[in-house]
Structure formats: structure tokens, C-alpha cells
Amino acid sequence: MNYFPWLTLIVVFPIAAGSLIFFLPHRGNKVTRGYTIYICVLELLLTTYAFCYNFQLDDPLIQLAEDYKWITFFEFDWRLGIDGLSIGPILLTGFITTLATLAARPVTLNSRLFHFLMLAMYSGQIGSFSSRDLLLFFIMWELELIPVYLLLSVWGGKKRLYSATKFILYTAGGSVFLLIGVLGIGLYGSNEPTLNLETLVNRSYPVALEIIFYIGFFIAFAVKLPIIPFHTWLPDTHGEAHYSTCMLLAGILLKMGAYGLIRINMELLPHAHSIFSPWFMIVGTVQIIYAASTSPGQRNLKKRIAYSSVSHMGFIILGIGSITDTGLNGAVLQIISHGLISAALFFLAGTSYDRIRFAYLDEMGGLAIPIPKIFTLFSILSMASLALPGMSGFVAELIVFFGIITSQKFFLMPKIVITFVMAIGMILTPIYSLSMLRQMFYGYKLFNAPNSYFFDSGPRELFVLISILLPVIGIGIYPDFVLSLSADKAEAIISNFFL
């Protein structure tokens, strides 16, 4: 047993250290930026060290478990622990947040508050991924919503208040269902209420009640993922947010919805999930086609990338709905892969906007010659987004595809239809990705414009982009690096469906 509270340290450290930002000497934004980056790097190193020396890959059970009495009145404990499902998203959170902090260098308005909110969001996200108590999970889930709302409403574009209000209405509405589900599942069927996930995994419910719980949790996570028709907050939010905030939203926030579906809907409510899995397959295929066909119609660059995110989330839904360990591993790999690629694309979109001050694709053109480094990296990462072989997206989508084919849950004909629709989605993806590149970088519009000299990527921007590109290629070449983390846990979750 591990006696050092590694997870408590990892969860509390960012927000505790972040609160000291307000006491730093007034010496400009440079001190604030340097301090925040230092905190993020130190947190990432702490997390990596704790996991390297204390986590056993071949053990599907909870590790680094911590359980402290918190509120004894209704048996509420500070209960943390990780397994193969949560270790990947936690490391992704640390990696993307560190790079997003580096990307936020141009932010000068209220710099202290901005960086504190990023660190508070960091704590909330790691807390959500490592919670082993349902009420603690809900508290952490809500904790990271407040920083996102403020980051949107203060440091966004012209319509920032509209998009921030829309975001908070959608997510707060979803949180109501999450709270009802948490309280219902915790208070059901015993004199002593329990919110301990280990205890709840072994509990059974009447089918009708389990379906009600399942629908409540599903709505909460569908808003965050997002699943259509709960997706309309996402393009508006991404269109108005600062690109460092977009990196956190697309890279981590959306993945919390997928994590919740696996951790609660699949693991706690397997019978209801088995009933709803055909609907997952339908929704996933519709989402891939709908978002991929809607994306080319978006004039705003960041909104087009946002719709591509909605389309790629469809593969995660299909992997979760396949009820196979292969499909579930593919979904987990897609969570990591898309988190990296989408963060890089939003960073590129933001740095391009900083130079040309145009947000709409039909106002751009001819950027390949003045900014060749950005053009090269944008092209490579767009290829990664459309699942080019050798990149992480290709491996993730291929594993999800094999998970559907090998599923015992579905007959041959539905499998063929789903595979055919997935193939159409894969054909539509290059259409919007390549047309985006064509509109931005080819032609003569901006190249021939007066005052058309732009600075190309500097060392900071190249460092951020190459730091993301290397794991994208690394996972594409050797996916076992990620799959070895989740394989045993995925097998343990799927075994519940065939008892």
C-alpha cells in the first residue's frame, strides 16, 4: 500500500500554488507567466514520477488509493485512486495545460487572474479523472466549469458574453442531471448511503431504475462530449475563446464527457448500457456524417475545426457502444489522440489570427509563402486529423473499426451499414480539412495585399507544435504505448457484460 498521498498532492497543488499568483510582486506579466509555467512543469514532473514508480500496468484494480474522512455527517470521504482508464487522461491534462500556458503568452489583460483560472481548471480536471467518490467527482466536475466561464467571458472575442452564457446554460443544465443521478444512485437501496465507486460497481438495480439513472448520467456527459443535439454550444465557444482556452476545451474538457460515459455509464450501469448500445452505434454514425458534412459550410476557421471535433467524437461513441475491449481501447486511444491533434489545430488557428487578424476563411489566402513554417505544421497536423496512416488518429479509428467488426452484440447487416457510414465519414473528413488548407494557404489574396509581411513561427510556437506532433507520430507508430495502460482495465469492464 502506498502511504504518501501522491494524488492529493497532484490534485491540490495547481490551485494552491495558483492562489499565490496574487501575492507575487508587481513586475509585469513576465513574472506571472514564468511562475505559472514553472508550476505546470513541476506538476507534470510530479505526476509522471508518481505514476512511473507506483503504478503497475498489469493490475486492473485501483492504485495509489487514498481515503480520508471529510464530512462524517453523511459519510462523504476524500477518496482518490487511479487505474488504466484514468492515467492516460491525467497525463494528457498535464501535457496540454503546460503547453496551453506557454501558448497564453500574448494575454496581457488581467494576466494574474487568467493564469490562476488555468491552474484552477487544471486541479478540477485532474480531480475529476482521479475521483473514486461520486459526490467528489461531481464537485470536481463543477469546479472546472467556473474558470472556463470566466476565461470565455473576459478574454474572448466580440460575442464572448453570448458564447459564455450559452456554455454555462448547457453545462449547468447537464450538471443538474448529473447531481440527480449521483444522489439517486448513492441513496438507493440501503440504510447507509454510499458514494464509493468500488462499492457501487458491485451493486445491482431494477432494470427500470437503472435505465433512469443511465439516462440522467448520459445527458450530463452528452452535453460535455458533446453528442448531437447537445453540441451547439461548442462551435460558438471555440469561435470566441482565446486559443489557449480552446486548447484546454478541445484537448481536455470534451474528453471528460467520454471518460464519464466509460467510468459511470459503462462500469456502474452495465445492464442499461447493454440495452442502449445499439443507440450509441446509431448516434455515433450520424454524428460522424452530420458534423463532417456541416464543417465545410463554416466560414470561421475555429468553428470549422470545432465541427471536426464533433465528428471525431463520433468514433469515441462507436467504441463505447461496441461493448468489446478492442472498441473500448480504441475509444481511449481516440481520447488521447484527438486531445493532442485538436489542441495543436486550435493553437495554429490562433497564431494565424494573431498575424493576419482575419477569422474567416474566405478572407484568407496565399499564406503559404509568407509563413512557411506555420503552413508546413498546419498541413501535417491536418493530415493527422484526417487519420493519415502513421499518425495516432489512424490507429485509433482503425481499432474502433475492428471493435465494431468483432462485436458479438450486433448482427452482420448492422455491422456492414455502420462500417459503410464510417467510411463515408472518413471520405468527408479530407474534404473539409483539405479545403481549409486550400482557402488559407493557396492563392494570392493576402500575399498580394499591401502590408502583407507576416512573421513566421518563433521558437515558442515551434516548441509547442513539435511537442504535440512528436507524441502524435509516436502513438501512430507504436500505439501500445497508450494501449498498454488501458488494456487490462478495458477487459475488466467488458467482462461485466457477459457474467
UniProtKB/Swiss-Prot annotation:
Q: What broad class of enzyme is this?
A: translocase
Bilayer-spanning residue ranges: 4-24, 35-55, 84-104, 111-129, 134-154, 167-187, 208-228, 242-262, 272-292, 305-325, 330-350, 386-406, 416-436, 462-482
Biological processes, Gene Ontology terms: ATP synthesis coupled electron transport
User: Which terms in the Gene Ontology molecular function aspect does this entry carry?
Assistant: NADH dehydrogenase (ubiquinone) activity; quinone binding
One cellular component term from this protein's GO annotations in UniProt: chloroplast thylakoid membrane
Pfam families in alphabetical order: Proton_antipo_M
What reaction is this protein's catalytic activity? a plastoquinone + NADH + (n+1) H(+)(in) = a plastoquinol + NAD(+) + n H(+)(out); a plastoquinone + NADPH + (n+1) H(+)(in) = a plastoquinol + NADP(+) + n H(+)(out)
Topology in the lipid bilayer is annotated as: Multi-pass membrane protein
The protein's superkingdom reads Eukaryota
Which keywords fit this entry according to its UniProt record? Chloroplast, Membrane, NAD, NADP, Plastid, Plastoquinone, Quinone, Thylakoid, Translocase, Transmembrane, Transmembrane helix
> Recorded E.C. number(s)?
7.1.1.-
State where the protein is found: Plastid, Chloroplast thylakoid membrane
Name the protein family: Belongs to the complex I subunit 4 family.
| NCBIfam families xref list | NDH_I_M
User: Which protein is depicted?
Assistant: NAD(P)H-quinone oxidoreductase chain 4, chloroplastic
Species of the source:
Citrus sinensis
